[in-house]
Amino acid sequence: IAFSARYNWWRIPQSYKKTRVLMYHSISEHIGKEKHNKWRVKPEDFEKQMNWFYKNNWKSFTISQLVKLDKIPEKSFVITFDDGFEDNFTNAFPILQKYNFKATIYLVPNQKINHWEEKNTSVLSNLLNNEQILQMQNSGLIEFGSHTLSHVNLSTISDEQLLNELKESKKEVENIIKKECEAFAYPYGKFDEKIVGFV
C-alpha cells in the first residue's frame, strides 16, 4: 500500500466505523533498485491485500458513492489509483474483478504536456487508453475522476492556470467516460483553502 509505512494505521487500534482509503499508483513489478519503486506495488502483494479485505468482510465503495451515503457502514474502504497507469487495467483490474471490489482512478487527460513521469529518466508505465477506460467503467466497478490536466502542483500556478487545469481536465475526462466526472484528487497532495475553493 502506497505510503503505508507513513500512516501506520494497522498498528494503532482503529474503529471499524472509520473508512480506510487505500491509495495506489502503479501495480507492477519492481525494477532493480529504481527510485520509482516506491510508487509500485507488486501484483502479488496487491492480490494479498485485496484477499485480506475480502476474507475479513470489508465492503468497497467508489469515492463518489461514499460521500453520498447518509450513514457509512462499518468495515468500509475505498481503493484509489492516481495517474491512470495502464497496469491498473492489466494487473489491478482482474484482481478487483475477482473480489468484486470497486475503485476510483484519477486520470491525467493531457498525456503530452507536463506529465510528471516525463520529467524523470524512467517512465513507470504507459497510461490507460480510452478503450481500457470504458471497459473498466462498463464493468460497474470502476469510477474515473480528474487528477488535473497536466499533473501540475496547483499551489505553484496562477489563478487563471488553476481554473484551466480544473475545468479542462474535468471536460476531458467527461469526453472519455461520457458521464459527469464527480471525483478529484490533488496532484502531490498539495492544496490549500484557495485551491479547495476553486475545486
Provide a role label for each language-model segment:
Residues 2-77:
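N-terminal pre-catalytic segment of deacetylase/amide-hydrolase enzymes
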Residues 43, 47, 86, 159-164:
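Non-membrane alpha-helical structural segments and their capping/turn regions in soluble enzymes
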Residues 87-88, 154:
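Secondary-structure boundary/capping motif
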